[in-house]
Structures are given as structure tokens and as C-alpha cells.
């Protein structure tokens, strides 16, 4: 209940702040944006979100708990916090997509959790001690954790976006 009220208050505050930016004056000319808007990759993102149809609501609740228990110490909010001397590669959808090999699918993330490699795919992070081993969790738990990561990376705009977004 509290979070719903907080969300409504935050939305109202944002609307008031945006309205206040106009300074009471209405502009009659359109300004060109200073930077082009980012172009979404709908085919790639929809493929990833399509994978989520394989998860029930109960699966995703369990997945969140598993992520928090097994990954949450180092990956709060999808960001990497330097444990195991990491290079601070986040779990944002873009970071997962641009990894070598790509980790933006459930199968790709399960593979990573079984055999973690550096972002460029060249270094075995188990051998260097830079990542924990999750092989003992079994395929189903790894699949659930991967589902949680994909869900957050495709639906939560703050996921993996920096250390200040906790």
C-alpha cells in the first residue's frame, strides 16, 4: 500500500517539477532536441521478454528471492559492486547484449553462471577467482535467476544503470 502511495506522490511531484520548468511561459516554437533519442531494438528486446512467458508469477517471485540470496551481494539493482575484483560490468540489457558471447537470453545467462568469463569472453573468471561458481544450484535455479535478470533488464529502467540508483 505504501509503495503504491509513494509511486503516486512521486509521479505527482515529477509532473509538478516538469510544469515548473516552463517558468509560467508557454513556448510557441518547437526546439530541436540536443541529442537524438535512443533507438530501441524492439526485435531483440521482444525476443528476450518473450522468453518470460515461460515463467509463471510464482516462478518470478522465487527467481527474485534466489537472485537476492545468490547474486544480490554483488549485483544490487543489476549493478556490479566490485566484489571479486570485478570490472564493474552491469547487468543492464545493453551490457548483456554486447557481451561476448551475448548474455541477453536465459540460455546465455545460465551458460555464464556455469562458466563465467570476462566481458570479452577471453578469461575464465572461475580460474582467476573473479566470480563465484553457481554449478551447485542446478539448472532449474539457474534458469529462474536468469529469468529474473531478463525481467529486470527489460522492464526496470534503473536496472544496471549505476551505483547511485539503489
From Swiss-Prot:
GO annotations of cellular component type: photosystem II; plasma membrane
InterPro entries named in the record: Cyt_c-like_dom, Cyt_c-like_dom_sf, Cytochrom_C550, PsbV_cyt_c550-like
Annotated localization: Cell inner membrane
Gene3D superfamilies according to UniProt: Cytochrome c-like domain (1.10.760.10)
Pfam families on file: Cytochrom_C550
Domain of life according to the entry: Bacteria
Residues engaged in binding heme c: 71, 74-75
Membrane topology classification: Peripheral membrane protein
One example GO MF annotation: iron ion binding
GO biological process, any: respiratory electron transport chain
Keywords: Cell inner membrane, Cell membrane, Electron transport, Heme, Iron, Membrane, Metal-binding, Photosynthesis, Photosystem II, Signal, Transport
Secretion signal, residue range per the UniProt entry: 1-32
Cofactor: heme c
Cofactor binding comment, as recorded: Binds 1 heme c group covalently per subunit.
Principal cellular location given in the protein's record: membrane
Family membership: Belongs to the cytochrome c family. PsbV subfamily.
Function, as annotated: Probable low-potential cytochrome c, might function in photosystem II (PSII).
Protein name stated in the entry: Cytochrome c-550 2
Amino acid at each position: 500500500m505504501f509503495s503504491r502511495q509513494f509511486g503516486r506522490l512521486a509521479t505527482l511531484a515529477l509532473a509538478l517539477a516538469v510544469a515548473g520548468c516552463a517558468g509560467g511561459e508557454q513556448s510557441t516554437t518547437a526546439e530541436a532536441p540536443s541529442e537524438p533519442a535512443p533507438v530501441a531494438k524492439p526485435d531483440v528486446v521482444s525476443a528476450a521478454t518473450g522468453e518470460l512467458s515461460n515463467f509463471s508469477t510464482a516462478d518470478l517471485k522465487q527467481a527474485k528471492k534466489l537472485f537476492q540470496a545468490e547474486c544480490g551481494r554483488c549485483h544490487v539493482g543489476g549493478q556490479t559492486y566490485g566484489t571479486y575484483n570485478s570490472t564493474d560490468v552491469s547487468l543492464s540489457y545493453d551490457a548483456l547484449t554486447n557481451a561476448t558471447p551475448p548474455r541477453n537470453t536465459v540460455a546465455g545467462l545460465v551458460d555464464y553462471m556455469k562458466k563465467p568469463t570476462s566481458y570479452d569472453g577471453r578469461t575464465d573468471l572461475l580460474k582467476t577467482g573473479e566470480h563465484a561458481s553457481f554449478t551447485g544450484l542446478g539448472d532449474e535455479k539457474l534458469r529462474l535467476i536468469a529469468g529474473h535478470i531478463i525481467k529486470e533488464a527489460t522492464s526496470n529502467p534503473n536496472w544496471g544503470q549505476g551505483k547511485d540508483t539503489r
